[in-house]
């Protein structure tokens, strides 16, 4: 409890220092005390020229206390955190042969994380930023990073349901998709309680339209889809047209589609109706691309929040910078991961608030540069657009909270977001590594449970547990 209280106070201090960074003309950075172990969580910022000495000293004392306690506080590693629910399992009839399973797998929508927004030179509210911590070569790569991200997603090939169902990360992608579905559904309901009709949504970084069905099920009236990748936007539009033209299709929202870099271009200049307001802006697995610079992050936030109606929400999913750096510092090299995902930084120990680049690779899905999103900084920057943070949870926390709801639990089954364990005699587990299911085997041995269990492999959980969900509300 003492460690938890200190961590909470520590987070508040991080927020104050992020605020100092936004208001000053000095680019700051955050780091982990060099004595931090794998289980430690002691993140800090380098003292900036505008920071008071006593705050920095107090923060250092915090770090020392957190590091000392981290080794004995029993903090779970990603592999130990995996929660098993014996009730969250597919029906027995769904555990037939592998080919049968592939044909039966009907998912709500394409569930590849849509990391489509990108980077560029923001022009709004520019400020001077000291770039001593950023190599000279990196300063000149803004356009290159933007082009790299757009090219990557433009070149991704569409694959059928059959092939996707055979993917090593089939359940991981379904699990991430379930997380988005629950988040979107919950905040659509909040909007509907305030506004009975005519709900308008901005999908910032829409990709190929993986969330279109979610918006349809949410009974919205208008959707604006925008993405940096032109090919992805065209595929998204085609998917929408296919949904609209189905004979048995119910009423579907109206939509417009925009190819633009949301960290470089002002979206209202491209809307059919520049005065249009939104009830929700959804930014799923995207906003980290904009944190190459302050200007880019600010432009992304302006696009996301400026046209939100009072009481509207900016919701999303993004990597948890604290978790990324914790794993990095626990690694013996500048990278970490497993056979599913890898994260590679340029160096340890120095993490600027903007432009802290790392390369992220997820098997067959993502292989592009990303940037750390220091969440206290995002929170502070959002205040400029009259936004208040109303919800933030790690994927683990979000799962544990939402799985208690029976509707969410049933949706988890329908979307096949957890893998049946043990596998049926006619099928096999997605991972061939025995230790990937040690947690499930142990749980099954020590508990009276109904089989099969529903779980993710250890490798998949390590990949998905680097993320968090968030929601900001537009104030009056």
Curated annotation (Swiss-Prot):
Activity regulation: Methyltransferase activity is activated by RAMAC.
What's its catalytic activity?
A: a 5'-end (5'-triphosphoguanosine)-ribonucleoside in mRNA + S-adenosyl-L-methionine = a 5'-end (N(7)-methyl 5'-triphosphoguanosine)-ribonucleoside in mRNA + S-adenosyl-L-homocysteine
For the modification Phosphoserine, the affected residues are 24, 28-29, 118
List the GO cellular component terms: fibrillar center; mRNA cap methyltransferase RNMT:RAMAC complex; mRNA capping enzyme complex; nucleoplasm; nucleus; receptor complex
Annotated S-adenosyl-L-methionine binding lies at: 180, 205, 227, 261, 284, 289
List, for all copies, the residue spans of the domain called mRNA cap 0 methyltransferase: 167-475
Q: Where is the composition biased (Polar residues)?
A: 20-50
> So what does mutating residue 452 to E actually do?
Increased S-adenosyl-L-methionine binding and methyltransferase activity in absence of RAMAC. No change in interaction with RAMAC
Where is the protein localized? Nucleus
What the entry lists under CDD domains is as follows: AdoMet_MTases
Q: How does it assemble?
A: Interacts with importin alpha, leading to stimulate both RNA-binding and methyltransferase activity. Interaction with importin alpha and beta is required for its nuclear localization, importin beta dissociating in response to RanGTP, allowing RNMT-importin alpha to bind RNA substrates. Interacts with elongating form of polymerase II and RNGTT. Interacts with RAMAC, this interaction significantly enhances RNA-binding and cap methyltransferase activity.
Name-wise, this protein is mRNA cap guanine-N(7) methyltransferase
* Originating organism: Homo sapiens (Human)
In the UniProt record, the gene name given for this protein reads: RNMT
